[in-house]
């Protein structure tokens, strides 16, 4: 497998999960202050990941949650975004102009900006009110955030069990990648010379 680094995979998962108490404290503070809705905002890969999470949230949470593509949000706006909104974002580089502009738009509307930005000195990180900085996948970062909101709303009774089981997530992800690699190699060997 190209660029496959087991230690990096484990470390990324561990770093995100290690932020549990800080994420919980930030979410609790937001909940105590009160909010009306949550906006998951992304572009490209972060949007795709947030879209996948929305599939789960729609069926398991009564919170008012919106999924917005950063470029569309800038161009079209959203009348539901305001002072009682929470905008949740993730970014690796923190340099994507559409994300930075979307966050600025959210701030202009008075929204609380809650985000994970790997590069803490980036333009996006500087615009983010509640900032967490660690490596790792966007899905897990969004998941731990939204599960913390669900816990505060009494919508996720298995919260502690999730974290117990998440301790083995790094190993599980490594095993999945190894198994997938084996199967793709077998497929390529079997069908690599097939005519189209």
Positions of PLM-derived features:
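N-terminal amphipathic/basic leader segments beginning at the initiator methionine
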Residues: 1-17
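Hydrophobic packing residues in well-ordered alpha-helices of helical domains and bundles
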Residues: 6-9, 23, 162
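A short N-terminal beta->alpha junction/helix N-cap motif
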Residues: 14, 18, 41-44
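A short, well-structured juxtamembrane/interface segment
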Residues: 15-34, 176-193
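Glycine-rich phosphate-binding loops that contact phosphosugars or nucleotide phosphates
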Residues: 31-170
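Oxyanion-binding "anion nests"
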Residues: 196
């Amino acid at each position: 497998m190209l660029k496959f680094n087991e230690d990096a995979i484990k470390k990324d998962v561990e770093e995100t999960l290690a932020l549990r108490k800080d994420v919980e404290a930030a979410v609790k503070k937001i909940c105590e202050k009160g909010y009306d809705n949550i906006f998951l905002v992304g572009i490209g890969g972060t949007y795709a990941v947030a879209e996948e999470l929305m599939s789960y949230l729609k069926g398991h949470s009564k919170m008012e949650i919106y999924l917005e593509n950063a470029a569309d949000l800038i161009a079209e706006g959203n009348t539901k975004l305001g002072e009682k909104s929470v905008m949740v974002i993730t970014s690796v580089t923190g340099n994507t102009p559409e994300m930075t502009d979307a966050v600025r738009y959210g701030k202009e509307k008075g929204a609380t900006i809650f985000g994970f930005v790997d590069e803490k000195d980036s333009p996006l990180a500087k615009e983010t009110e509640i900032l967490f900085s660690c490596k790792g996948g966007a899905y897990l970062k969004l998941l731990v955030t939204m599960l913390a909101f669900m816990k505060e709303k009494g919508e996720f009774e298995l919260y502690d069990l999730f974290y117990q089981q998440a301790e083995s997530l790094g190993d599980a992800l490594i095993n999945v990648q190894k198994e997938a690699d084996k199967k793709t190699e077998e497929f390529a060997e079997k069908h690599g010379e097939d005519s189209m």
